[in-house]
Amino acid sequence: MELPAERTDGAYPNAVEVKISASGERNYTHYYDTATYTSLWTAYPLSAKHMGSISRPEEWSFNPNLSTSVQVNLCNRSYTNSDTYVRGHLIPNASRNGIKEMQLQTFYVTNSAPQIHTNFNSGIWQTLEAALQSVAKNETIYIVTGVAFAKQGESKTITYTTAKDDTKRVPIPNYFYKVVLKVATNSSGVVTSASTVGFWFEHKEYSNSTYSSYAISVDQIEAWTGFDFFPNLPDTVEQAAETNSLWTTFQNF
């Protein structure tokens, strides 16, 4: 339901779509750019069954679906400037700590990006993740988490870091975003209506955790990233849903 459309404009010639499964069930899918060692987006469903209280793993691991040569060794230690940047989950541990195998797969190094720890990863970003988890306790929602180095047509300086146990240069995202979907279906399971909302953050420290102030439409995030989100919705449903820019409208759908 939540997979973005295949990119055909040649913008990311080194990117591959990778499906991560656990016990025959799809856990999440990520669009991994081997040139930047970055998952440009990570898409996953979220419902009550995915969340629980399994203890957080201590170590990360390589993604077995990709060669280690195109991954950054963040297995045992983080980035060289780890006082500032941490391994920021794209699909959070707390969104998969109800099923052990799925949880461990969120600790693949490909499910991380360098993220400011203080007042971002541990602040507004974490608060948004918790809000989405709260909604998903009562219904299934569909999420795409992404990174961007620049908006479409924008010129932006990119800063790089390295891992303590690797020499590969890793670009630090200038933006992080999420787009989220809820659907309503008829008795035959056909989607009859939907609600979406997006969140777009400049990658910096925030003095508060009021994530709702950064809610925008999915249409706007599509314009900034060049990705087409939720293409599996019926066209009329998608067009109506992707104009919403209010968190409360999404919550109350």
What is each model feature region?
Residues M1-F253:
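Domain-level detector for secreted/extracellular nuclease and nuclease-toxin modules, and
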